Amino acid sequence: LTEAVSRKPYYFSVSAKMVSMADRDIIDDAGDYYCAFGWAFARGKGKKAAGYSRPCNIFAACGGAAIYRRDILLELGLFDEAHFAYLEDIDVGWRARIRGYRNRFEPKAVVHHAGSGFSGSRYNEFKIRLSSRNSVYLIGKNMPPVQILFNFPFLLCGFLIKYIFFVKKGYGNIYREGLKKGWKMCMSEAGKARKIRFSWKYFPQYMRLEGEMLYNLFVRRLFS
């Protein structure tokens, strides 16, 4: 990872090749993507590890096994403690992308990963409440208002799909509670202070990120 992140001065982070602890021929995470539905998802999850053998650019490094450049991390303002437990890696990677830095995947760095080792299960109140809260905060923090407006139909659809999913799982109220808390975080004085201010200097990066989020939705998520 150290060698990979040192290859270019604009590489902010490098994500390891995370294979399943239960089956080391299967990918658990090969870098993270983010799409216009407001969903973060693991690249390659559940697929054969042999198919992920080349370095490439990713939306953000998975914080479960990654390296970050300290100088850039200090420039960005470190990890946001308000993003506790979920999506903090997407947040810091997104902030880096806005400034023109890159996040990479390095297949030579292999980690055996036990998914949901911290929260204890794939679906539980702790995870659903925090991840839904943070998903709203992530958008409010990193998207300028016009980008939120443009993506609103996609975001509404994404949140509605997840809400219906969690209703069926018996966690609808928990998911809705998390969304409300995320909105309150965005509207709080602390949330407003942490919001990334739009700058025309970074307009090309915003356009590139928007295109990537749409591509991740329609090509990598819906029709993959």
Identify the function of each model-found stretch:
Residues 4, 138-139:
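Short alpha-helical functional segments enriched in proximate histidine and acidic residues
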Residues 99-102, 106-124, 134, 138:
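Active-site donor/metal-binding and catalytic loop motifs
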Residues 1-39:
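Conserved donor NDP-sugar-binding/catalytic core segment of glycosyltransferases
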Residues 26-27, 39-41, 47-71, 90-92, ...:
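A recurrent flexible, glycine/aromatic-enriched loop bordering the glycosyltransferase active site
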Residues 13-15, 22, 42, 105-107, ...:
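Hydrophobic residues in well-ordered beta-strands that form the structural core
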Residues 148-224:
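Non-catalytic, C-terminal membrane-associated alpha-helical segments of glycosyltransferases
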Residues 1, 59-110:
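A short, conserved alpha-helix in the catalytic core of glycosyltransferases
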